[in-house]
């Protein structure tokens, strides 16, 4: 049973990622699971049991039933991307706050409809990008904004890849055009794009151009691709995402005075700590045989895993709205929209034989 200070969350769908977020809800001090829904009552029951849901959790055999539950404040929605626009809008119309898995939609037009519904009904929306809630990320932003240690940003490289096995490449929803049809771009690319935007203080690039050589499956879903991003003042970024390459998740940001590197930015090597390296005004010794000042490593200890930090922040925002009459925080849908815009631009460039795509006015 929820306490007065806990936000009551319903889980809409029993996707694999929902196991991780269910644990995060258990760990977050200001949230609890109050309901779960699947299109099969038996599946919802089995999922609740397997994930140690509270005995008081209501089990729903349809998404509609979960939406009608008056004892649910907010929904976590891990449905396939193609279903987001339908169910997120329905959730908003029922006054439910929404923690929406990424990518948030198949395109920005769909996401704008979701945001319009949220704004019309006064509900909070946040996407499920977990790493931005890790305490490490605040320190990354602090270094990037330090004019003495980092200077002015010149370029960012970000990548996320993993090697899907034969079963994944044949059967996972992320390779199915009718489910998560954005493929590696929407899944892995979302993270790499978010990292480049974060480093650029969420200023959208002027142009986006996909690199030739994107790999698509027989159904036309992207399995691997890369792109370059360019800003008006000469800043650049490159992103790479793939279901066909070794597990890698890196950010390198280079400024006029400093360099930032993160080797595990999406999922830390260890759940309870996260590291990054920085260097400032690096140079060689007189004989150019070694560095005078090699990069320094910084480690951040975490009380909660980053996904629980995400739930805690989401629940805090919902609590402010529910209990204190606060307005929804527009920062979260705004950065979701910018990420989706760049995802859309990369896909458009791939579809148009790697043409340069302008983001002016979007």
Curated annotation (Swiss-Prot):
Family, as annotated: Belongs to the Gfo/Idh/MocA family.
Stored SUPFAM superfamilies: Glyceraldehyde-3-phosphate dehydrogenase-like, C-terminal domain (SSF55347), NAD(P)-binding Rossmann-fold domains (SSF51735)
Oligomeric and partner information: Homodimer.
Domain of life where this protein originates: Eukaryota
One example GO MF annotation: oxidoreductase activity
Designated name of the protein: Uncharacterized oxidoreductase At4g09670
Keywords in alphabetical order: Acetylation, Oxidoreductase
Positions where N-acetylalanine occurs in the chain: 2
Natural source organism: Arabidopsis thaliana
Lineage: Eukaryota, Viridiplantae, Streptophyta, Embryophyta, Tracheophyta
Pfam families: GFO_IDH_MocA (PF01408), GFO_IDH_MocA_C3 (PF22725)
Enzyme Commission number: 1.-.-.-
Entry keyword Signal: no
GO terms for cellular component: cytosol
